[in-house]
Regions:
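Periplasmic c-type cytochrome electron-transfer domains
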Residues: 1-192
Length: 192
């Protein structure tokens, strides 16, 4: 069970009374919105940095087996970085996937409507053309997402922050979740 308050003060509750109960025709699930700030910086981390930090066989004997998550991107394998379970290799692909899965819009990346084989009405429904979102619009959204800056750190008590950072390293989180990265060059956003 999970419960809490939305900013407007509206109470919400999710309770699984019987997790083995079959789902009905319609199923819903709670979602946590992904963090959007700083995604442009993550997109610019060179693949070599991520591959270099991987240790799938625990060669350094620290009991952590960090792995690179590879995804199919067109005809090539790339590192998954964005979306649930890191299923998208770039911020542009993540945005196109969100337009397809969350909004039902086609792009040059995802040309087919978000319909299953069992939804013939969905496949024949009117739409805004193919693709519905132009490459220039997809690129504009990607540029906007790339430029969303990480806010300044707001820490009232720096000693508490430093203790948290120290614990993050001590328990081994920093072995996979590298605290500092250097971005690669960006032609569109050279200041990143």
């Amino acid at each position: 069970a999970s419960n809490g308050n939305q900013p407007a003060g509206v109470q919400f509750d999710f309770t699984a009374t019987d997790p083995n109960q079959p789902l009905g025709d319609t199923a819903i699930s709670g979602r946590i919105s992904p963090q959007l700030v700083g995604m442009g910086l993550l997109d610019l981390i060179p693949e070599a940095n991520i591959i270099g930090a991987a240790d799938p066989d625990d060669n350094n004997k620290n009991d952590i087996s960090g792995r690179v998550h590879w995804v199919q991107d067109g005809k090539q394998q790339r590192i998954g970085r964005f979306g649930w379970k890191a299923i998208n290799s770039s911020l542009r692909t993540q945005n196109a996937n969100a337009m397809s899965q969350d909004m039902g819009l086609t792009t040059s990346v995802f040309m087919d409507p978000n319909c299953t084989a069992n939804q013939p009405i969905c496949w024949t429904a009117p739409n805004g053309g193919t693709p519905e979102v132009s490459d220039s619009s997809l690129d504009a959204v990607t540029d906007f997402m790339t430029a969303l800056a990480v806010p300044e750190r707001r820490v009232a008590d720096l000693s508490t922050f430093n203790k948290g950072a120290q614990l993050f390293t001590q328990v081994g989180c920093a072995s996979c979740h590298t605290p500092k990265q250097k971005t690669g060059a960006s032609v569109r956003f050279p200041l990143l």
